Structure formats: structure tokens, C-alpha cells
Amino acid sequence: MLYHGVDLVEVARIRHAVVRYGQRFVQRVYTATEQADCLAGSGDVRYEALAARWAAKEACAKALGIGLRGLGALAVADRPRAGFHEIEVVRDNDGRPVLRLSGFAAEQAAALGICALAVSLSHTDELALASVVAWAG
């Protein structure tokens, strides 16, 4: 069985959150590895990279059937949730994005019988897009 999630994010939304909340927002949403990868650049490229990873986290949550309401502080009360750090976008040896799951996100993937995940990221200066395909079986 295949599961799919897709998300589109306005880069300006992420830029606004970073400018308004600073490191508090960045540390709450992104792992140390993601921060190092995204913030290594300069200028608006940093916001584009952060937005693409936000989109990947949300697309993955959708593929897992938990959606945005199952992530972080936005989770519905009395329902299990995944923390933002539990869906991590890292790079493989060739620089391609790869998803790494932990905690409830990993448990949900196991419950669905997911054996592989693929993520694709794309962004412009205005929009970031992520698509996640999960294979079960």
C-alpha cells in the first residue's frame, strides 16, 4: 500500500516566525542537524530551506495519517502526537533529503507497516513544496 502527503508553504510565513520568535521557534521546530544544514547559508536561502523542511514535516505527518493536528503544540488534546523533532529531514551521502523518524512518528509508521519513505523538496523565493511517499507491505 502507498501513502502520500504533500504540503505547500509560503516562505514568508516561516521568515516571519523566525524574525518574530527567533531561536525559540527554530529550536522548537527543527533538530540541531536541520538547523545546521539550513542556517549554514546566507540571506533568504536560509528561510527557503527552513520552509522546505517545515513542508516535509507536514507532508510526512499527512502520509502517516496524523496531519498537522498531530504535530507539536497544535496536537488535539487526548490524542497521541508527534513532536516536530520526531520527523527530521537529513541528507544522505549524495546530499539528497531523507526522512528520519523517531518517537510517536516512528511508532505510527510501524503501525501502518511502512517500510520505506521518499521525500522530495522544492522551493522558490516565495514557496516551498514537499511530497512524501510511504510504502507499506
UniProtKB/Swiss-Prot annotation:
InterPro entries: 4-PPantetheinyl_Trfase_dom, 4-PPantetheinyl_Trfase_dom_sf, ACPS, Ppantetheine-prot_Trfase_dom. GO terms for biological process: fatty acid biosynthetic process. It catalyses: apo-[ACP] + CoA = holo-[ACP] + adenosine 3',5'-bisphosphate + H(+). GO terms for molecular function: holo-[acyl-carrier-protein] synthase activity; magnesium ion binding. One of its GO terms (cellular component) is cytoplasm. It holds the Pfam family ACPS. Its EC number is 2.7.8.7. Keywords: Cytoplasm, Fatty acid biosynthesis, Fatty acid metabolism, Lipid biosynthesis, Lipid metabolism, Magnesium, Metal-binding, Transferase. Its cofactor is Mg(2+). It is found in: Cytoplasm. Belongs to the P-Pant transferase superfamily. AcpS family. Transfers the 4'-phosphopantetheine moiety from coenzyme A to a Ser of acyl-carrier-protein. This is Holo-[acyl-carrier-protein] synthase. It comes from Chloroflexus aurantiacus (strain ATCC 29366 / DSM 635 / J-10-fl).
